[in-house]
From Swiss-Prot:
This is Large ribosomal subunit protein uL18. Pfam families: Ribosomal_L18p. It comes from Geotalea daltonii (strain DSM 22248 / JCM 15807 / FRC-32) (Geobacter daltonii). Keywords: Ribonucleoprotein, Ribosomal protein, RNA-binding, rRNA-binding. The keyword Ribonucleoprotein applies. Part of the 50S ribosomal subunit; part of the 5S rRNA/L5/L18/L25 subcomplex. Contacts the 5S and 23S rRNAs. Residues 8-21 have a biased composition (Basic residues).
Amino acid sequence: MSSLSQKKNSRLKRQVRVRKKIKGTAERPRLNVFKSAKHIYAQLINDADGSTVASASTLLDEVSTGLDYTGNKEAAQKVGAALAKKALAKEISKVVFDRNGFLYHGRIKALAEAARENGLSF
């Protein structure tokens, strides 16, 4: 097994293990984060009825304007700020953070801190 597929399998195992414990509700949805090499995606999920409350990613024009590259910490900060603004518009201030098996470092940390700075608490 190559080191890349082993790393992905380890992340998926962490994801399953944590997902058993973390559930989002209507009052406190789950902030789910996914990152690829070029983009980062974040969404607020209500697990009780399986719906997405709000979402933001570097694919949105409001986030990607003014960015040279969408796969860095600066882009992650803009995604976190945009998601926090959408959540506060729907009167959601408390969330459960789900890092989706990724390490809390780099882009994941930048997104989380930007969301906290813009009004979300977790």
